[in-house]
């Protein structure tokens, strides 16, 4: 099944290089020998304009298994984000990434990253993954927004882009 996964991921890369949303980054990691590891992608999602996430660029790793696209990739913020739907490990809790819920093999990397960006500003409080962020989001929205704005400054787009290019 690995051949199918590798072929699909090569296509995803080709489509991404031709057309991707402004400010987003998605690229396979390079192996020590300079070849690309299509099963391990470094990505970054910009905070949407006019939201508390604006100004930040949030790094995320996508790990694909041999049975992709039958199963979704594992998406993990590195470092983990303060968000109700991000586990303390950084793993994203999103129905699109759950093969038993909304995952479909036709979903592209671009669609996933846009979906995760949308989740940042619209948490799903029915499916919390991080107790502290969930409680603060529900009980003290002003404090939650203050914490998120600090993260946006901490992960300023210019700094993260520079780190990813090194």
From Swiss-Prot:
<dbReference type="GO" id="GO:0061656">
    <property type="term" value="F:SUMO conjugating enzyme activity"/>
</dbReference>
<keyword id="KW-0547">Nucleotide-binding</keyword>
<feature type="active site" description="Glycyl thioester intermediate">
    <location>
        <position position="93"/>
    </location>
</feature>
<dbReference type="GO" id="GO:0009952">
    <property type="term" value="P:anterior/posterior pattern specification"/>
</dbReference>
<dbReference type="GO" id="GO:0061629">
    <property type="term" value="F:RNA polymerase II-specific DNA-binding transcription factor binding"/>
</dbReference>
<dbReference type="GO" id="GO:0005635">
    <property type="term" value="C:nuclear envelope"/>
</dbReference>
<dbReference type="GO" id="GO:0160096">
    <property type="term" value="P:nematode pharyngeal muscle development"/>
</dbReference>
<dbReference type="GO" id="GO:0009792">
    <property type="term" value="P:embryo development ending in birth or egg hatching"/>
</dbReference>
<comment type="pathway">
    <text>Protein modification; protein sumoylation.</text>
</comment>
<dbReference type="InterPro" id="IPR016135">
    <property type="entry name" value="UBQ-conjugating_enzyme/RWD"/>
</dbReference>
<keyword id="KW-0539">Nucleus</keyword>
<protein>
    <recommendedName>
        <fullName>SUMO-conjugating enzyme UBC9</fullName>
        <ecNumber>2.3.2.-</ecNumber>
    </recommendedName>
</protein>
<feature type="domain" description="UBC core">
    <location>
        <begin position="4"/>
        <end position="157"/>
    </location>
</feature>
<keyword id="KW-0833">Ubl conjugation pathway</keyword>
<dbReference type="GO" id="GO:0032093">
    <property type="term" value="F:SAM domain binding"/>
</dbReference>
<keyword id="KW-0067">ATP-binding</keyword>
<dbReference type="InterPro" id="IPR050113">
    <property type="entry name" value="Ub_conjugating_enzyme"/>
</dbReference>
<comment type="function">
    <text>Accepts the ubiquitin-like protein smo-1 from the aos-1-uba-2 E1 complex and catalyzes its covalent attachment to other proteins with the help of an E3 ligase such as gei-17. Required to sumoylate the ETS transcription factor lin-1, Polycomb protein sop-2, and intermediate filament proteins, such as ifb-1. Required for embryonic development, fertility, vulval morphogenesis, inhibition of vulval cell fates, lifespan, and neuromuscular activity.</text>
</comment>
<dbReference type="InterPro" id="IPR000608">
    <property type="entry name" value="UBQ-conjugat_E2_core"/>
</dbReference>
<keyword id="KW-0808">Transferase</keyword>
<dbReference type="GO" id="GO:0002119">
    <property type="term" value="P:nematode larval development"/>
</dbReference>
<dbReference type="GO" id="GO:0005524">
    <property type="term" value="F:ATP binding"/>
</dbReference>
<dbReference type="Pfam" id="PF00179">
    <property type="entry name" value="UQ_con"/>
</dbReference>
<keyword id="KW-0217">Developmental protein</keyword>
<comment type="subunit">
    <text>Interacts with brd-1 and rad-51. Interacts with smo-1 and sop-2. Interacts with bet-1 (via BROMO domain 2). Interacts with isoforms 1 and 2 of X-box-binding protein xbp-1.</text>
</comment>
<dbReference type="GO" id="GO:0016925">
    <property type="term" value="P:protein sumoylation"/>
</dbReference>
<dbReference type="GO" id="GO:0032880">
    <property type="term" value="P:regulation of protein localization"/>
</dbReference>
<dbReference type="GO" id="GO:0000122">
    <property type="term" value="P:negative regulation of transcription by RNA polymerase II"/>
</dbReference>
<dbReference type="InterPro" id="IPR023313">
    <property type="entry name" value="UBQ-conjugating_AS"/>
</dbReference>
<comment type="similarity">
    <text>Belongs to the ubiquitin-conjugating enzyme family.</text>
</comment>
<dbReference type="GO" id="GO:0005634">
    <property type="term" value="C:nucleus"/>
</dbReference>
